[in-house]
């Protein structure tokens, strides 16, 4: 079968998932005809993605979250105003996505959490089915429980996630924990998409904890902690 990937260009996770899924599809005799990647003024394509992906890559203007002053989280008010001003560009991007779905001859579209994919299917109704992939779709699973946090922010997170999956045929929620299929929300939990290079690495014991920070502002917090606790290796 012929697949078209549409990838949200923010962060590294969606890129590695796309690379891994392409490898799996190619091994099983399928074809990825093209990869569309959302871009903005703050996003650049990482080198490992260009080196690893085999299908042609094309880019389109996509919504972007603007950070707070401390660069630890998204500034929702600022992001909403910014993206509202960019709405004409996003409409052109949706026309472009719809065009690429038709012209590539794709039989299935795979969406890696890109908002404009859901909006394109809601507005243009392409005949090609599409499947959403990402751990974020666990947020919509009927058995998933959020911690006691800001209910408004959690509602907005779920709302955004639903918008990325409008008119989708299925949502593949990446999860280390097995959960039953949620037929009402068309959600199937599957294991995380991990690259072969990672699984081939030989683990070694070390006196450290490896962490991942979504926003660079958290690095200041780590450095401040280390300054107060120099006995903890950094």
Model-based region annotation:
Residues 124, 128-189:
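Active-site-proximal region of nucleotide-activated glycan assembly enzymes
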Residues 1-4:
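Extreme N-terminal starter segment of soluble prokaryotic enzymes
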Residues 7-19:
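A short, glycine/small-residue-rich beta-strand->loop->alpha-helix junction that serves as a flexible
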Residues 174-178, 186-234:
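Active-site donor-nucleotide binding/catalytic segment of nucleotide-sugar enzymes
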Residues 71-108, 115-116:
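Conserved nucleotide-sugar donor-binding subdomain of glycosyltransferases
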Residues 21-30, 224-229:
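A short, Lys/Arg-enriched amphipathic alpha-helix followed by its capping loop at the start of a domain
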Residues 44, 109-124:
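An aromatic- and histidine-rich active-site surface loop
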Residues 9, 27-86:
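Conserved nucleotide-sugar phosphate-binding/catalytic loop shared by glycosyltransferases and other
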């Amino acid at each position: 079968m012929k697949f078209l990937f549409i990838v949200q260009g923010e962060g590294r996770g969606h890129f590695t998932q796309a690379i891994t899924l392409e490898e799996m599809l190619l091994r099983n005799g399928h074809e990825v005809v093209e990869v569309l990647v959302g871009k903005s003024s703050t996003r650049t394509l990482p080198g490992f993605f260009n080196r690893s992906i085999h299908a042609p890559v094309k880019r389109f203007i996509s919504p972007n979250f603007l950070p707070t002053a401390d660069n630890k989280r998204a500034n929702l008010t600022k992001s909403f105003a910014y993206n509202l001003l960019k709405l004409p560009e996003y409409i052109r991007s949706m026309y472009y996505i719809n065009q690429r779905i038709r012209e590539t001859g794709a039989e299935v579209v795979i969406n890696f959490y890109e908002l404009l994919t859901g909006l394109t299917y809601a507005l243009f109704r392409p005949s090609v089915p599409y499947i959403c992939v990402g751990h974020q779709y666990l947020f919509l699973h009927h058995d998933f429980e959020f911690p006691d946090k800001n209910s408004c922010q959690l509602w907005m997170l779920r709302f955004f996630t639903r918008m990325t999956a409008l008119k989708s045929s299925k949502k593949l929620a990446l999860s280390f924990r097995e959960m039953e299929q949620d037929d009402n929300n068309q959600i199937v939990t599957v294991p995380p998409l991990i690259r072969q290079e990672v699984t081939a690495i030989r683990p070694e014991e070390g006196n450290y904890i490896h962490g991942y920070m979504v926003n660079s502002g958290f690095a200041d917090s780590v450095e401040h902690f280390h300054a107060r606790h120099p006995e903890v290796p950094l």
